[in-house]
Amino acid sequence: MLPPFESDETPGNSLTLLSGAPAPVGVAICKDMDFIRPALDYGRAGAALVLDPAWDFSVDRAWHGHIAIMRGVENGYAVAHTAKNGFLTVTDSRGRVLGEVRSDRAEFASLLVDVPVQHQDTIFDRYGAWFPGLAGLLLLVAVVQLAMVWRRSASEAI
C-alpha cells in the first residue's frame, strides 16, 4: 500500500479469477503488477489474460504500464492494462503490443482488439524468482572480489 494515501486500505490475500471465460481471466489492481507476486500466482493458476485497471500518473504512465507487460511475459499471459491517466495497452503473452491508446488526452478513450486467450508455460512460471536472487549473489561476489583487489593494490602501493 502507498502511505499515506492508501493507509486505510487492506491488501487482499487471494487471487481473483473470473469464471465463464474460455480460459482463466485474472484481475489485478494497479500496483499489484509492480511486484513478482501476485503476478506469478496468476501465471501458476493458468491465467490466460490478466485485466489490470490502474490510475497511472503523469510521472509513471509509460513505466507503470510496461511493468505490467513484463509481468505478462514472465508468467505467460496476455495483459489488458487500462489506466485512468496513462495508456490503455493490450499485449499478448509474449509482450507484443496488440493495441495502445493514451487515456489522458481526452475525456474518454477506448480500444478494441482481439486478444489471444491462451496461457503459455514459462520458466519463471515453473521455477519462480530464482534469477534475481542469483544476480544479487553474483553482484555481491563481484563487489567482494573488487574490494579485495583494491585492498591488495593499496597495500602494495605502500
Regions from the PLM with identified roles:
Residues 1-158:
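Enzyme catalytic cores with a strong preference for nitrogen-chemistry domains
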